[in-house]
Amino acid sequence: MHILVTGFAPFDNQDINPSWEAVTQLENIIGTHTIDKLKLPTSFKKVDTIINKTLASNHYDVVLAIGQAGGRNAITPERVAINIDDARIPDNDDFQPIDQAIHLDGAPAYFSNLPVKAMTQSIINQGLPGALSNSAGTFVCNHVLYHLGYLQDKHYPHLRFGFIHVPYIPEQVVGKPDTPSMPLEKIVAGLTAAIEAISNDEDLHLALGTTQ
């Protein structure tokens, strides 16, 4: 399969974003998949246009977006995105939407059509912290996952799409002893394992849910 993997530019006054750092270190061939890479701005208003133009000019079987989730201690494939922008902080264009629908003609939520449980289990099988997430937040990460679902629904019915959040890397938590992080090479290994699992036509039937 031809897979586009995206990462984000740094945001919130940070100098690094582990999502893009990890994406740049992925091999160009993973299993039977050919990997293209794209850096996205952390911008509500710009990401849709960039994704739209990229999909209009290239054929991809899968788009997998990667984002930073500071405070998480595991690599977390996302199950679902919701139709809301509700930004706790401004994006890199100083835009801070609050309680705004992403697409007025879109569904309340879009579920990733990738085998998210198989991807999560593949990460865990590498001896790495992995967990299935049921919330991509309400910042630009959720926005991108929702927009991909919207595009699949309205324009690209055969497109497979998903999102994975990754933790901070150690240099981001200097002076923050209680904040979890993960070495970049482990994030790269986890993403590689997840991408390999995309080959699964059907997801695994595993109890990876949560009680809260």
Curated annotation (Swiss-Prot):
Positions of the catalytic residues: 78, 141, 165
Lineage, top-rank taxon, reads Bacteria
* CDD domains, per the entry: Peptidase_C15
Catalytic reaction(s) noted? Release of an N-terminal pyroglutamyl group from a polypeptide, the second amino acid generally not being Pro
Query: What is the first-listed, main subcellular location in coarse terms?
Result: cytoplasm
Q: Which InterPro entries match?
A: Peptidase_C15, Peptidase_C15-like, Peptidase_C15-like_sf, PGP-I_bact-type, PGPEP1_Cys_AS, PGPEP1_Glu_AS
What are the GO cellular component annotations? cytosol
Q: Which GO terms describe its biological process?
A: proteolysis
Localisation per UniProt entry: Cytoplasm
Q: Does Membrane show up as a keyword for this record?
A: no
A single Gene Ontology MF term assigned here is:
pyroglutamyl-peptidase activity
Q: What is its EC number?
A: 3.4.19.3
Q: Which UniProt keywords apply?
A: Cytoplasm, Hydrolase, Protease, Thiol protease
| Role summary | Removes 5-oxoproline from various penultimate amino acid residues except L-proline.
Q: How does it assemble?
A: Homotetramer.
Similarity field:
Belongs to the peptidase C15 family.
Q: Which HAMAP family match?
A: Pyrrolid_peptidase
Q: What name is this protein filed under? A: Pyrrolidone-carboxylate peptidase
